[in-house]
Amino acid sequence: IFKREGDFGGGADVFEKFFLETILPDTEKRAGLDNPERQLVGISLSGMFALYAACHTDAFSGIASISGSFWFTGFLDYYRSHPLSPAVRRVYLSLGAKEPKTRREPLNTILERTEDVLGIVREEGKEAILQMNRGGHYVHRGERLEEALRYLLSGSEWKGEFSL
């Protein structure tokens, strides 16, 4: 994708195991939480990871992918053959309106790929929305996170100042 950087090295399965078996239990223990309802939110590559992880575990009831890297070669085919866990009830997707305007391939397919993901999620019977925001990939992260959490926790769409 970028000339000066190497290809992405994988490792999602190793991280997923570490996250589910170490990070979550340790964090919940320290916070005094017992069997909480969990939402998994990611931005960019971690946004793609959030959806990927939700195909393998019933640990989350909601998934948010903010500018998820669904352009990643092979992801859409993988997702089509690995549905989300039945535990997932809601999925929130968002993009910055400038993201699909790049000339760089395959990044310029991000809107089409995200719409494909939205369609698959809905075919699985999940509640899902795609929210467009002003700006590009990492713009207005705080507001986009708030929009995601409001939707996942309430099922109600909330549009902030930078939503379209």
Regions found by a protein language model. Name each.
Residues 1-164:
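Non-catalytic cap/lid and distal C-terminal segments of serine-dependent acyl enzymes
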